[in-house]
Amino acid sequence: MRTDRDNWDINTSVGSTALFVAASRALEATKPAPLAADQYAEVFCRAAGGEWAELVAGGVPEHPLRSEDFGQYFVSFQGARTRYFDTYFGKAIEAGVKQVVILASGLDSRAYRLDWAPGTTVFELDQPLVHQFKREALDQHGAEPKAVRAEISVDLREDWGKALQDKGFDPSEPSAWLVEGLLIYLPADAQERLFESIDQLAAPGSFVGIEQMTTYADVVFAMLVAGANESGDQANSDFFSLIYNEQRSEAATWFRCHGWDSERTELLDYLNFSGRTLPEPSQPAWYMFNSISLVSAVKG
């Protein structure tokens, strides 16, 4: 159960979801034609050890990420989501943006993967123990970032704007923001404050990329929670205990109303466009995927 001031490392609470997602990206990268190839996802899993290291080594056949009714689709989802936001950042790079802010950066490796313009700084905001795990894993692997990387240890439910500026962020210059895999772990009022902070800190010409998950109807949410608990799948049960299923602002509309040119792509449409098999409406993955949209916007 979440509390207003809970915190975590890479193995607990919200932090543990980063390993689940990294493992998905690692499995996607092994496909003959991956939607995205994150070479560092496997590094994180091996550094975590245990089932994560075994999974990327080809073991743990019963792992939820190998299941036919959910796992195979979730792996494709992570490939699609990664590709979408990699492409989004490519547009920001082409526009000359040299300030990048990744909120709840987790095990995001874009500071190491993408070809940033010289002079770019990637600001990564997350819990201190998450930063520590990521830094140590990449250092041991000998990885070198392709931009200046600035770690900011902060709770995104609090005022993080000052901490960002203290690290050298300049609100008078354009920036590119990423809100990926975050909003469902925030209460609705915290999301509102997050959007307001981005808008206040972003100069004209700035970009924002957001993953949005529509609130489930109460009856659907109760059904999904009951199904997760009955399945014995601890990861699935934990997911529903971590998220806030609250009515909240729709991202594309919010930013459009605040002077941004925004566009929204439904995840199912993007997966279909990418040539991936979609889950059937009777499968658990369908309820999740049908509620997810990918948003990008540019500030006028």
From Swiss-Prot:
Transmembrane segments: none annotated. The keyword Transferase applies. S-adenosyl-L-methionine binds at D126, D155, L156. Keywords: Methyltransferase, S-adenosyl-L-methionine, Transferase. Its EC number is 2.1.1.-. Coiled coil: none annotated. GO terms for biological process: methylation. GO terms for molecular function: methyltransferase activity. It holds the Pfam family LCM. Belongs to the UPF0677 family. Exhibits S-adenosyl-L-methionine-dependent methyltransferase activity. This is Putative S-adenosyl-L-methionine-dependent methyltransferase MAB_4328c. It comes from Mycobacteroides abscessus (strain ATCC 19977 / DSM 44196 / CCUG 20993 / CIP 104536 / JCM 13569 / NCTC 13031 / TMC 1543 / L948) (Mycobacterium abscessus). The lineage of its organism: Bacteria, Bacillati, Actinomycetota, Actinomycetes, Mycobacteriales.
